[in-house]
Amino acid sequence: MAKHDIEERGDGLTEKLIGVNRVTKVVKGGRIMAFSALTVVGDGDGGIGMGKGKSKEVPVAVQKAMDQARRSMVKIPLRNGTLQHAVIGKHGATTVFMQPAPEGSGVKAGGAMRQVFDAIGVHNVSAKVHGSTNPYNVVRATLNGLMKINTPADIAAKRGKTVAEILGAE
């Protein structure tokens, strides 16, 4: 399972290849080999997308995954290169816990989560995976958690207060 940077295609997006798996379908005449690729694409400023591609050849699978990731991009509200608040994400048997970290802490996360944070533009975060560490589940759980992030303006609107009241600066 190789981890690569495939930088830029001219559109300013960072592409990360998280993993390539060889899969086999057993049929009457023998085995049919194919490949599946998992990728994330980010703009370095809160935009992130995930894609999975399958093909009989690795480059085609990777290209399909990159294209799907570009089509599935979402915007996550960040604050000074870290998260707005601590958040938990779940997918399948995977639970991820992510919390903001002070400036200079760096990305304290392993495996597939580190690739997601690099692509999205988070520079200071502490994260932990509980349960299954399958890369696909970890990426999905991370994105599910990131999509739960609320900005102070969102919370103020829900409560009918001002942002200053929410932040405690009165």
UniProtKB/Swiss-Prot annotation:
Q: Which gene encodes it?
A: rpsE
Subunit structure, per the record?
A: Part of the 30S ribosomal subunit. Contacts proteins S4 and S8.
* UniProt protein name: Small ribosomal subunit protein uS5
Single GO MF descriptor: rRNA binding
Concerning InterPro entries, the annotation shows:
Ribosomal_Su5_D2-typ_SF, Ribosomal_uS5, Ribosomal_uS5_bac-type, Ribosomal_uS5_C, Ribosomal_uS5_N, Ribosomal_uS5_N_CS, Ribsml_uS5_D2-typ_fold_subgr
Q: Domain S5 DRBM: where? A: 13-76
PANTHER family in the cross-refs: MITOCHONDRIAL RIBOSOMAL PROTEIN S5
Biological processes annotated in GO = translation
Recorded hits in SUPFAM superfamilies, A to Z, give: dsRNA-binding domain-like, Ribosomal protein S5 domain 2-like
Q: Has UniProt tagged this entry with the keyword Zinc?
A: no
What are the UniProt keywords, alphabetically? Ribonucleoprotein, Ribosomal protein, RNA-binding, rRNA-binding
Function, in words: With S4 and S12 plays an important role in translational accuracy. Located at the back of the 30S subunit body where it stabilizes the conformation of the head with respect to the body.
Organism (species): Laribacter hongkongensis (strain HLHK9)
Gene Ontology cellular component annotations, sorted alphabetically: small ribosomal subunit
Keyword hit for Kinase: no
Query: Which HAMAP family does this UniProt record tie to the protein?
Result: Ribosomal_uS5_B (MF_01307_B)
| Alphabetized Pfam families for the sequence | Ribosomal_S5 (PF00333), Ribosomal_S5_C (PF03719)
The record comments on the domains as follows: The N-terminal domain interacts with the head of the 30S subunit; the C-terminal domain interacts with the body and contacts protein S4. The interaction surface between S4 and S5 is involved in control of translational fidelity.
